[in-house]
Amino acid sequence: MNIIIDAMGGDNAPLEIVKGALSAHARFGCGITLTGDETAIRAAAAQCGAAQLPAGVAIHPTTETVDMCDDPATVFRRKKDTSMGAALTLLRDGAGDAAVSAGSTGALLTGATLITKRIHGIRRAAMAPVIPTTTGSAVLIDCGANAECTPEYLLQFAYLGNFYAQRVLNVARPRVGLLNIGAEDSKGTDLQKQTLALLREADGRGDLHFIGNIEAKEAIKGGCDVIVTDGFSGNVMLKTIEGVGSFAGSALKTMFKKNLLTKLAALLVMPGLNEFKERLDPNKVGGTAFIGISRPVIKAHGGSNAEAIENAVGQAIQVAQSGITEAIAEHIDKMQLPTA
């Protein structure tokens, strides 16, 4: 298993990226290919105590980087030798089993689509983070890759999320819900109403276990295993979860500091609070998979530290070993999707 990592992507590149890559190599025993400025990568490795890279860790040198200000639609035409582009090209050409980048989300999605390519028959790749729920976790698809969607896109997202839940989360029969403002069939815009009809048809064929519309609050309670939505609404939901978690943590911290009694109470509940905090910590999650691309691509968050990169590599290995891309390609013709 070899994981290709864009060493120059993210706010903390290359030091934290290289540090996380070295930790992942030691932890998982996988091969690592770092793409980027060779001098900078070696200097970062030296700072991590690796004057010489260990066997199994290689560098693919590049001369350019994708900056956050670069236009995702044109960056790979203007810059021919970027660390991100090289990672995706190596992945396409079979030099690795998955790619990880903490760089620009838009550029990574565009590059994955143009360079690594979508699975034949998939109209739009989607971002599918695994979010915490009261009872466990759920796949949220899409959460930012496609702000505007058609009912057909959402239907495909349901299938993609279903495969991810089965293959990666090991849910035998995922419950698929359509994010909406109410559970009734009459709720939502034309997009939700038309998608609802398509998903009910898929359920009737036995392709999906569709439970109907679901409100965000019910989804967070564990009401379904796959939450289907457009990228705009999904991103709002994801950022709200992150914001509420941060708010709750700050509020509890302030409350427990009030007096001696509250400080003593904090000691009693600290293990539970730490567990809650870890479930919401993006560094523990690692990254988000782009589902629908022909090879596994993992987007680590822009502020990733070494721990996040290490966990993103672990996630990349899990996705690659799950065979999800092969399963999607194998079953794409059986999904009975409306033709374009």
Locations of regions flagged by a protein language model:
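N-terminal phosphate-binding or glycine-rich loops at protein starts, especially the Walker A/P-loop
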Residues: 1-43
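Phosphate/nucleotide-donor binding subsite
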Residues: 50-96
